[in-house]
Amino acid sequence: MATSLITRKLRSAEATNDVEPGWLKRQVTGVLQSISSHACQHPIHTIVVIALLASTTYVGLLEGSLFDSVRNSRNIAGQVDVDTLLQGSRNLRLGESTSWKWQVEDSLASQDYTGVNHLALTTFIFSDSLSKSSSIAPAATELPIPSNASAQPVPFTPNLFSPFSHDSSLAFTLPFDQVPQFLKAVQEIPDTSSDEDDGEQKKWIMRAARGSAYGSGGAIKLWLADAWGSFVDLIKHAETIDIVIMTLGYLSMHLSFVSLFFSMRRLGSNFWLAATVLFSGVFAFLFGLLVTTKLGVPINVLLLSEGLPFLVVTIGFEKPIILTRAVLTAAADNRGRAGQASSSTTKSIQDSIQTAIKEQGFEIIRDYCIEIAILIAGAASGVQGGLRQFCFLAAWILFFDCVLLFTFYTTILCIKLEINRIKRHITLRKALEEDGITHRVAENVASSNDWPLTESESSNKTSIFGRKLRSSSVRRFKILMVGGFVLVNVVNLSTIPFRDSSQGAGLPLLSRVSNVFAPTPIDPFKVAENGLDSIYVSAKSQMMETVVTVIPPIKYKLEYPSVYYAALGESRTFDIEYTDQFLDAVGGRVIESLLKSIEDPIISKWIIAALTLSIILNGYLFNAARWSIKEPEVAPVPAAPTVAVVEAKKEYPKIDLNPDTPKRSLEECEAFLKEKRAAYLSDEELIELSLRGKIPGYALEKTMENEDLMSRVDAFTRAVKIRRAVVARTPATSAITGSLECSKLPYKDYNYTLVHGACCENVIGYLPLPLGVAGPLTIDGQSYFIPMATTEGVLVASTSRGAKAINAGGGAVTVLTGDGMTRGPCVGFPTLARAAAAKVWIDSEEGRSILTAAFNSTSRFARLQHLKTALAGTYLYIRFKTTTGDAMGMNMISKGVEKALHVMATECGFDDMATISVSGNFCTDKKAAAINWIDGRGKSVVAEAIIPGDVVRSVLKSDVNALVELNTSKNLIGSAMAGSVGGFNAHASNIVTAVFLATGQDPAQNVESSSCITTMRNLNGNLQIAVSMPSIEVGTIGGGTILEAQSAMLDMLGVRGSHPTNPGDNARQLARIVAAAVLAGELSLCSALAAGHLVRAHMAHNRSAATTRTSTPVSAAVSAARGLTMSSSE
């Protein structure tokens, strides 16, 4: 119980346990899910509203600070603003009531000092007066002090940087009621050290008297300079230990920011998620600041600058990171289960967010409540010095941070998941297109792999927030969202100067917020300690009660007397150049009111332009707001075979295909065909046209396609049916193909849209193939069922027995030693010398770099690894080896080879080169070759397992030494005697072919993929077995992997499609699985062969009375194993 009251940062991992959620947790989680659900249903609305609210808040802050100084500059006119100089002053009382100790009092306005000696103590700082290149600061006697003012110099107080500063200082004390007159008199001090005789001389100008001479641009610069000067003064009068602590605090805060970005990068977001977390924190700060100041709690910049770094470091960004990890994990889990769930139970993006909130929401709220409670306790404490005020502000910041986490940030996560879905869709589609698949088929496959599933339509558009968009709109969407937010705020900031200062009264909610930027009260003892000591001695000796107002230091700068140019600046009109007009308008010197500013032609055009941009932006954002994610209401339907393409939901008009309907004439049918209305003809009419040669057999699918009449699946199925009839009735072959039309070859209920243009032509149906699973087999710590499509009995059972033995020894371990598909074109040259020159150039660094750049430019996935050349007469063979991502990659690499050869012929001086063939059998593809066995092709994998001796005897019914001897004599010596290349195994091809057929691989590549050497040895009484397969050619996208049944098997193995973060990992994992399955098959067959009773066991336990096929070593081996098992059980 006590552990639950500790925040997550302080709890150990062991303290978290899965228990039944209590009543409070269920209620809190339900509220959070409801809030986040409403926010995510309208993501654009949520983001825009919150961003505009935050913009309004900080515009109020700036309107009361930065631009107030800009407006006020027009009222200075070279005069001293005494009230401005007095801001930040502190009052100190000394007398009997304070036991003759300095006591800090409240502001001057709230005190009555009648009958008290009220003095003012001011310090003048002359910038750079001690530097060699500058004039000397004036002495105290050189100041133009009025005759009726009794200002007396007192010792000034040095600061931390005084020993190496170039500034000099003077301090004066005088009666407080003489301060305005005194400051106005000393706003300009002559420079007595100047040697200038002619013209205007420089003077020491008080900082407050410099504003109006520079127009609006100068006023803004003045504000920035004042802010920087205040910061420097604060540093100068701070203690060393305070500076060290604050420096460490700010360093820690920025390290927290860096840690946030690294954490989000590990979760898959390089920038945007971390940036939105920071935006959410800034919004929470603005809202908390608004509420705090509205409630009358005084907050200033000094308090914020000292407290915020430690608040950021203490609270951190753990909660957004935890929620992000939970949402992304839930999305990945839902996506993984999407292929196994029925259409009525498919999870959506919102379901992922709801699941994450259900798992982590209550714990996050609990942590917020604990932290807020601690801050409330700090705010209620009696500790002075700003702690109470900052704790009050921090509690509100955390409250709004919690609210924004489950509204603003969950909306951002919803958009992130949507963008991730679009990226997966586009990546898969482009990878399929690069592998040679048509755009339409690639789009269908990518749509069927989408999560959540979207309607597959024949277009190049994708869905975002329920609306179809082009793929190129994704990046534009992100840029417009961010750019739009920035633009709205730029317009807000830029229009502030055009608002009348009286407008502040119309925003009472923001009236107190501007006080945040008011000058921070100074520490009088750090600024004027020596002067106070002098006053103390005088007051104590006279026993006179004294109040001293310590005025913040006033800076002087040596420059020409700008106050004299103020009058000239006031006389400027709109007749001068437009640039000056605009700057004066921004500064507020010409604008008397908003109405007057609109009358100016330049300003009015600027306002109209800003208004136009705002309207365009709002139109885009609120049009995008209609893209809200809405969950479709899905009525429960009975279980039925799932079809990936959901186009059949559309209702189509019925067409009359009754064979008894009178047939149209041939001329009418041809007219329908020319009008591209052939789909309206009956089947018999279409068969007749095809037999007469009017419709080519390969064009039936294209002819049948009519989206207004039927779906593509139905049209293609009809095309297959018609083609079967055409083949059966073709006069030249009807004697032997006549039975095809009514044969048992199935053709219905198959998605031919994935076949057309990708896998097969002239389709007349599909062949069902028995599919079994072997295993489970543990591979690198993960258990798999191995899908195997075969017509050879007991092959799956044999592999399963090997898997059982391997699992008993701890599973198989695999190592990937190479990954690179190859293509070996043949090029010819007129002479041997030219061919040799080309070989030397390709083998050089220059040739390799040029060909690599050309090759890599053709694909986002293909990356050239190695070039190998061989010369045969005037023919040059070049073997390109490259990575191909998760595709098997033959088409992808062929495009790269063509591009590289073109660049070599046209740009590298080999224009006499002739490309004989893009494939010169130097690859080598679909043929047994020593080059594949030595250099590898595709994935090179080694799989190993250690089988305990007792498992060999009990499960495999064999002996370790017998297995080792059999492997040496059969697989090694026997294959060598036969002159085999890569055939040093028992039956690797059996398993490779079965897995290839089940997972949509190219069965013809079984030739080189089955190259394998099996090794065995006795390791301390245990059997160590390994298979080395240097050329496994597999892919998880493209080819037959796009078919529904085959992709389901890839899904079962967890390697379907392209890997989301590291392209190529899925294909490499499939190669590991194939090698481990071969290892299991090799172990089982060799064990059965080593048993020595194959013939007797096969004859005794053969279940087929009549011979239906020739027995194989596998069937005999597994039958022998069954016989031995049955015998032992008896």
From Swiss-Prot:
EC top class named in words: oxidoreductase
PROSITE patterns documented for this protein: HMG_COA_REDUCTASE_1, HMG_COA_REDUCTASE_2, HMG_COA_REDUCTASE_3, HMG_COA_REDUCTASE_4, SSD
Family label: Belongs to the HMG-CoA reductase family.
GO cellular component: endoplasmic reticulum membrane; peroxisomal membrane
Official protein name in the record: 3-hydroxy-3-methylglutaryl-coenzyme A reductase 1
Residue ranges, compositional bias (Low complexity): 1103-1122
Binding site for NADP(+): S859, R860, F861, D886, A887, M888, G889, M890, N891, M892, I893, S894, N1102, R1103
Catalysed reaction equations from the record: (R)-mevalonate + 2 NADP(+) + CoA = (3S)-3-hydroxy-3-methylglutaryl-CoA + 2 NADPH + 2 H(+)
Consequence of substituting P320L: Contributes to acquired resistance to azoles
Note: Mutations of Phe-262, Ser-305, Pro-320 or Ile-412 are associated to acquired resistance to azoles, clinical drugs used to inhibit the activity and kill Aspergillus fumigatus cells during infections.
